[in-house]
Amino acid sequence: MSRLPSKTKYHSSHRSLNRKTPLLQRSSETNSLRESGIETASSQLSLAASSYTPIDEEMTELELKIYLFLFTRALNHKLGYTQENNPDDKAQKAGIDINLDCLNYLLEILYQNLEPQLEKGANLSYHKSSTARKALEYHETLNSRLKKKIAKDAEHKNPLTLLRILNTKTTSISTLIGTGGGIGITGAGAIAGSAAAGIGTAVTVGVLLFYLCWRTTSEYWKKKNAEKLFEHTDQIDNENIIELVSALSAFYIVKEFEHKNMQKASLKLSLNPESLFEIFQNIYHNKSFRLPSQLPIQKELKAIAKQAKIDADKIHTHLIEYVNTNKAQSISINLYALIIPSFAYNSEESPTVVKTVAALHAWLWALDKTLDMKDFLFRNSFEKRLEKVRAGVVKTMKTFKEEVNNVLLETDDSSSGVSLLADEDKTDRVKEWVNKQKLPSPGALSPIKSASHLALFSSLREQKDKAVNSSGSRLSLRLGN
């Protein structure tokens, strides 16, 4: 496969910002970058993180909560959910049961990691919190819907129709034949009944054969249409493949968490390159469809899947440590667990808001891909579908970044970026705005601790020094000097 220039730039490590490094270069360089530390829970997090500007060290806890609040509002908008919608109206929720309470619970988990020094008693009591219970309830609903979705897809996309009917529908076929014979027998006596039975049997078998022929033909053309997407391999670059595999990897990890007891520290994910590659083919294609062995894409997929296995093991280890450290064994590990490893993998360094927001967006991206897998391949090409996702990410980020700037900064004209407010006035204005917005927090806002947050974001100093500040197109979220 020819290596096309990647459109995505990403953070090469959690200590430095490199916006000029392609998402996938030579394997040796890729391995070297990965050895410097896992930046994200999956390769998709790197894609999401590339759109975000590092936040200044002067960021206060209050301002941080505003930032996260705006993001939760953007997420709710993406999910099609608003407080005015009827919670029972499934159509309004775009097929995903999640609301502000659930997102609030996610944020509380983030707050505890972003600010370990919160006042005693401010932390949630995980096993008693109403928001925790609500989050678990929504998870169960979503998980149930996801299972039904997968089961329905498997039912309609299984190409082994003939074997399935012969193996599992024998009784039904016999019943149809017997019914035809029974109608004939009761309608015309023994002789006429035998003839009618023969006719009924012939009609039944004829209909069955017609159905099988139609289904086989349909599967054949679906397969041919899928193969057309791979006729020109240079149109599918490494970036697209990484995005697809990342979504599948996230989905697979969720299914593993669902069936395992997280109290066992020795637990290992059963993810391996072969199984991930098999999942890729079985979900995004018909089960009978296999990529031609001569295509380099197969080798590329296996290489990426192998690295996904390494990443998954490390993520899983850190998640176990997080659960044990926070005495949260009683909480079932569900979908929101995917966002924890992105900032909990290294307890020695404070996490950045960049990673936090990237993790949230990537989590929803993977979930969206999983729920939409049914007609993904046949409805749109890879390029159109993924470009739509990229555009949505960029648009969402720009929208709420601009809203933050509009609230926190007053300028003398639209082109000026100079704040006319003193720090104290700015803080008062922020507090006033927060009160009007009704932040989704169960408790009162913690006091602003500029000193602690200077330390919290000290790890960003090196990033800030190395960031490209000369470009006027960079969207800044600078909140103070």
Swiss-Prot record:
Residues 24-34 have a biased composition (Polar residues). Its main location: membrane. Keywords: Membrane, Transmembrane, Transmembrane helix. Residues 1-18 have a biased composition (Basic residues). Residues 1-37 are annotated as: Disordered. The chain crosses the membrane at residues 172-191, 195-214. The keyword Transit peptide does not apply. GO terms for cellular component: membrane. It is a multi-pass membrane protein. The keyword Transmembrane helix applies. It is found in: Membrane. This is Uncharacterized protein CBU_1818. The lineage of its organism: Bacteria, Pseudomonadati, Pseudomonadota, Gammaproteobacteria, Legionellales.
